[in-house]
Every structure is written in C-alpha cells, then in structure tokens.
A protein has these predicted regions:
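Charge-rich, low-complexity N-terminal segments
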Residues: 1-52, 58-109
Length: 109
C-alpha cells in the first residue's frame, strides 16, 4: 500500500487540533488546581512520530508564570491519561508545555 503523504499530513494536523481542543477542555473543566485557572492552550505541535507534543500556552496578565509552569508539570500525568482515554493513538504523546505570553483575559465566569 502506498503511503499518502498528503493524507498523513492532514491526519497529523487534525490530531494537533484535537489534542489542543481536549487539553483546553480538560484545563477548563477537569483540573482543580487554582494555579491553572485562566491558562489557555493556543496550539499543539506534534512530532512526526507522534511521541512528543509541544503545548503552547498563554496565561492571564498578572499570573505567576513559574507557578503555572509548576502546576502544569504536576498535572501532566493526569492530562496524558485523560488524552489516552479520549484520543485514539497507539501511544499518547509526552507533553512539553511552552510559554507564549501573558495576555489580558476577560472576567472569569
């Protein structure tokens, strides 16, 4: 069977979007750590072998970047387990969080 590079690229891109959406949902609805309030996932860059994912994130202006990064580190195993339950992959990628920026976010709900 011929390997369809265009189809593989589409699948890769679709998985990046799916992982980003799932992480947004998990951070918003399932993670109870107050240090992760008002953290937004902006993009996911999945390695070509699907083993690693760089998760780009932003935080609300005034939040402690160091506290958020420590909280993300603590939550990584939980997030990977939940991703494994919701996204079909042979292996759930290792997550590496990459800070992008502090931004102004609207009031909390």
């Amino acid at each position: 069977m011929k390997h369809d590079k265009e189809g593989a690229g589409y699948r890769h891109q679709r998985l990046e979007v799916s992982i980003a959406e799932e992480l947004r949902s998990l951070l918003r609805d399932d993670v109870s750590d107050p240090d992760l309030d008002r953290v937004g996932v902006t993009a996911v860059a999945l390695s070509s072998d699907y083993k690693n994912a760089k998760v780009h994130f932003v935080i609300a202006r005034g939040r402690s970047r160091a506290a958020v990064e420590r909280a993300l580190e603590r939550a990584t195993a939980f997030l990977r387990r939940r991703l494994a339950d919701s996204i079909e992959l042979k292996r759930t990628p290792d997550l590496r969080f990459v800070f992008e920026a502090e931004i102004d976010m609207g009031p909390t709900e």
